[in-house]
Amino acid sequence: MAIVRHAESERNVRRLAAHKTGELEYGRDVRDMDVPLTTRGEKQAEATGRYLSKRFKFDRVFVSPYLRAVQTAHLMLRPFAHHPRLTHEERIREKEFGILDGLTRHGIINKYPNEWKRREREGKYYYRPPGGESYPDVALRVHSFLGTLARDCRKQSVLVVCHSVVVLTFRRLLERLSEKELLAIDRDPELDVCNCAITWYEFDPGAGESGRLALREFNGVHYPADLASTDECRRKAHVDFGF
């Protein structure tokens, strides 16, 4: 199973700029599910697709219904000689941020100071903003999705195109990470899930009583460094298309 975060979106760019300039919000004029890819994001997806097509043959593709994920999936699949069945899957959509959607850290502190205090008290993992989700909420739906895969996709290769929080949630569930272990990954800038980064698992029959999926790569960036969205991802980027 290969899990890929969507390519760079217009909101990713606006969010980064807003944090640097101290703005309160970014991209609230467009619904989160309607945010498209940037031109650079399209190139990231195309390059990642070329890499994947040389190494994997997928039987099924599951994609978040958010536009940026759907665009990423279609662009990545272009180089594949065999086009697998593609399914839009609500359970791997972006984490819902509720009233905090589109706000920077400064924006949350300025507009909802009590919510910021509650988040500090409850911690990032368990905090649920009004109208939004916590990490455990996301884990519940991803756990349900994994149950569907176990039932319907046994002995198949699967590609999942989703979002950074969902990628980390897959790791939490598949590797049985604790809250502390997950947040340590989330806090480390060197482990920040890059746009179009690949995380993949392979079934290991020797693991556990009846075998389980074993992590083979986390956050692999397989496109040229000049297409990377951040300095951290630029350091990870390498070109290895296998031509």
Predicted regions and their residues:
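Acidic, low-complexity terminal tails and accessory targeting/binding regions
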Residues: 1, 82, 95-107, 156, ...
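Phosphate-coordination/substrate-recognition cap region in phosphate-metabolizing enzymes
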Residues: 1-2, 10-11, 43-117, 187-199, ...
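An N-terminal RHG(E/S)-centered segment typical of histidine phosphatases
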Residues: 1-58, 71-82, 207-243
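Short, well-ordered beta-to-alpha junction loops that form the rim of enzyme active sites
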Residues: 6-7, 63-67, 91, 131, ...
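Short glycine/proline- and acidic residue-enriched helix-loop micro-motifs
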Residues: 28-36, 117-136
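Glycine-rich phosphate-binding loop signature in dinucleotide/nucleotide-binding domains
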Residues: 54-57, 149-156
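Internal catalytic-core helix/loop-beta-alpha segment
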Residues: 128-151
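GST superfamily/GST-like fold recognition
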Residues: 164-168, 214
